[in-house]
């Protein structure tokens, strides 16, 4: 038997701080895919549909006496037929994909000012690859080209959400 022990100091990891969170589990909380026009859309769709994507992040404390939270990343991708003429109204809805993907996390004594950014920026960033894969798979399995979600700036999303909740008084910048 050989001796293969790992010494963190030898690997240069003696000063690596511990993450202030642990992901306990991840799960698909809600998943829906519908083609409102049914099979007729496949016969009449002449060009690539226009796709709009909406994203939201929510965090809720699960237990009052423990730092255990559920973070839910909700995505709605809706595809519509392109307008018949330039500047016209979009046509029929081609498909709607809705996914709420969640993680249950435990926070390990982070500074108070970091709790919100950890829950609304860091955790969504960590679970986003799973969301991207599920949305891509469900749209492909629905008979359409896969919808590949582009990277999301969760910091900007968090800041926009904060600005809506706590608008600055007029005259202050």
UniProtKB/Swiss-Prot annotation:
Swiss-Prot/TrEMBL keywords: Chaperone, Cytoplasm, Protein transport, Translocation, Transport
Listed GO CC annotations: cytoplasm
GO molecular function term, any single one: unfolded protein binding
Glycoprotein keyword on record: no
Gene Ontology BP terms: protein folding; protein tetramerization; protein transport
Chief localisation class: cytoplasm
Highest taxon listed in the record's lineage: Bacteria
Intracellular or extracellular location(s): Cytoplasm
Record InterPro entries: SecB, SecB-like_sf
Assembly and binders: Homotetramer, a dimer of dimers. One homotetramer interacts with 1 SecA dimer.
PANTHER family: PROTEIN-EXPORT PROTEIN SECB, PTHR36918
Biological function: One of the proteins required for the normal export of preproteins out of the cell cytoplasm. It is a molecular chaperone that binds to a subset of precursor proteins, maintaining them in a translocation-competent state. It also specifically binds to its receptor SecA.
Stated name of the protein: Protein-export protein SecB 1
Organism: Gluconobacter oxydans (strain 621H)
Gene: secB1
């Amino acid at each position: 038997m050989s001796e293969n022990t790992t010494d963190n100091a030898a690997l240069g990891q003696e000063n690596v701080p511990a993450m202030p969170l642990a992901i306990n589990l991840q799960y698909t909380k809600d998943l829906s895919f519908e083609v409102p026009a049914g099979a007729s859309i496949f016969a009449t769709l002449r060009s690539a549909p226009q796709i709009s994507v909406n994203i939201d992040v929510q965090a809720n404390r699960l237990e009052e006496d423990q730092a255990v939270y559920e973070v839910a990343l909700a995505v709605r991708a809706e595809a519509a037929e392109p307008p018949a003429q330039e500047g016209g109204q979009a046509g029929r809805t081609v498909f709607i994909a809705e996914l709420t993907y969640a993680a249950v996390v435990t926070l390990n004594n982070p500074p108070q000012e970091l709790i919100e950014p950890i829950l609304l920026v860091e955790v969504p960033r960590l679970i986003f690859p799973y969301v991207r894969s599920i949305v891509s798979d469900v749209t492909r399995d629905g008979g359409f080209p896969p919808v590949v979600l582009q990277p999301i700036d969760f910091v900007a999303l968090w800041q926009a959400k904060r600005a809506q909740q706590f608008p600055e008084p007029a005259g202050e910048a």
